[in-house]
Design a protein with these regions (language model features):
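Short, small-residue-biased leader/transition segments that mark boundaries at the very start
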Residues: 2-4
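N-terminal low-complexity, Pro/Thr/Ser-rich intrinsically disordered segments
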Residues: 6-23
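Long, folded non-catalytic interaction modules
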Residues: 14-16, 25-29, 94-113, 138
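Residues that cap or initiate secondary-structure elements
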Residues: 17-19, 49-51, 159
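Short amphipathic alpha-helices and their capping/turn segments at secondary-structure boundaries
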Residues: 23-39, 114-117
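Active-site histidine-acidic residue metal-binding/catalytic motifs
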Residues: 30-102
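Active-site-proximal beta-strand/loop segments in catalytic clefts of secreted hydrolases
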Residues: 46-49, 88-91, 127-131, 155-158
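Active-site-proximal helix/loop segments of hydrolytic enzymes
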Residues: 102, 106-124, 130-171
């Protein structure tokens, strides 16, 4: 667990994880390469909160939302890496024209389950969001002279220290 924390992962103080649950030896022994040779979809990109926008987004322009970001990531993975991507552009957090995030994960789950049943070749599933941060926070750093946005991969444990396992979310 300490190695995970020392290499860029954060374990939130409201939860916990054991070495057995991480199963690092099992993970490190797996071949995680994606073989695009079959031409079948290997990556699924979707957006539980597809209406999320950025500070400079133009109102009503879907290309300026996280869905537009997903379009660009799809293009890069397909054109630069040859990895076939299924990009689900469904806006799961707008119901009858009104933004409603309360059931977005339920709606997305139904949609994603159907896609995964239709395309069992998919190996990687990415739900792309954007974080809301204070106006004075800048999540850009210089990498080799290129301004680069910080990204975060979130792998969640469905339990809290206070209440234990969360019954409706499976680890």
């Amino acid at each position: 667990v300490r190695c995970v924390e020392e290499t860029g992962y954060t374990i939130d103080s409201s939860t916990n994880v054991t070495a057995e649950e991480l199963a690092a030896d099992t993970l490190l022994s797996k071949d995680l390469h994606i073989d695009p040779a079959s031409g079948e979809y290997k990556v699924l990109i979707y957006h539980t909160h597809g209406s999320e926008t950025f500070a400079d987004s133009r109102p009503g322009v879907i290309e300026d939302t996280v869905i537009g970001l997903g379009d660009e990531l799809t293009r890069i993975l397909e054109e630069d890496y040859g990895i076939p991507v299924y990009h689900d552009r469904t806006v799961y957090d707008v119901v009858d024209g009104v933004e409603d995030r309360s059931l977005a994960y339920d709606y997305a789950s139904d949609g994603i389950d159907a896609i995964l049943q239709q395309y069992p070749s998919i190996e990687v599933v990415l739900d792309i969001h954007r974080d809301g941060v204070r106006e004075d926070v800048r999540l850009v750093r210089d990498i080799d002279g290129v301004p680069t946005a910080q990204i975060m991969f979130l792998n969640g444990m469905s339990r809290t220290n206070e209440n234990g396992e969360i019954d409706y979310l499976y680890n």
